[in-house]
Amino acid sequence: MSYAIFKHGGKQYKVVEGDIVLLDKMDKEPKALVELVEVLAVSKEGKLSCGKPFVNGAKIEAEVINEGRGKKVITFKKRRRKDSKTKRGFRRDFTRVRITKIVA
């Protein structure tokens, strides 16, 4: 089984063909094709090729499914005996993509 490890938005993802991955928001329309070129490693037929830092000529082709927002994450800080508290929420914007092809 072939897989690839790529970098997008400061994070690294390990994928195989057909996987659905949540990436940082990319402002692409649904059904649009995306090429991910920052491929760190590719394994095909048991042979692993690692890049320094990226694998030459390797890319991952993906299709945009949709965009969305994640669940709200709440951070709450309270300082005891001081009548001081802070509540802040955060929702991640993401683009859901399907990995269609790994080219190495």
From Swiss-Prot:
GO terms for biological process: translation. Keywords: Ribonucleoprotein, Ribosomal protein, RNA-binding, rRNA-binding. SUPFAM superfamilies: L21p-like. PROSITE patterns: RIBOSOMAL_L21 (PS01169). One of its GO terms (molecular function) is rRNA binding. Part of the 50S ribosomal subunit. Contacts protein L20. Belongs to the bacterial ribosomal protein bL21 family. This protein binds to 23S rRNA in the presence of protein L20. This is Large ribosomal subunit protein bL21.
